[in-house]
Amino acid sequence: MPRLVLSLFAYLFCSTLLQAQAWQPFGVRQLGFTFDVPPGFVLTQHEDQGAAFQGPRNAFLAVWGARLGKASFRAEIEHRMMEDEKAGWQLSYRRVTPKWASYSGVKNGEIRYVRAIKVCNDRAALFTINYSRFEKTPYDPIVVRMVRSLKAEGC
């Protein structure tokens, strides 16, 4: 019995370690940001400014950089929130600061979480993830790690 418990512990420890290492770095150097893509997400589209990934059970992740132009960071985020509301997303959380912003909402049984950071003066880096609201609990730590991984780099 002790061997079984020890074997199970070793398996779980190694599985957790492998899963932690399965995050893939992604970045757009010319736009000045890096980001970690969670395990299980497969690249479906890649362009100069960002990429889209398909995740388990139809989860969708997009990460990209944007030049702000004449718009301020706050104005850009408020515009995105307004567009999402027009598209039917019921926003339940909003936080906009001078250097970062987050908001989330629900629509048709899905959760959308958006995170943006200001990078390199006139640019922003953003990610959006959509997933089933029935998977909120397992996605919470994934979203937290993605938020922490979105960083300015190479300005």
Regions found by a protein language model. Give the residues of each.
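C-terminal partner/receptor-binding element of secreted or periplasmic proteins
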Residues: T137-S149, C155
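Bacterial N-terminal signal peptides
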Residues: S7-T16
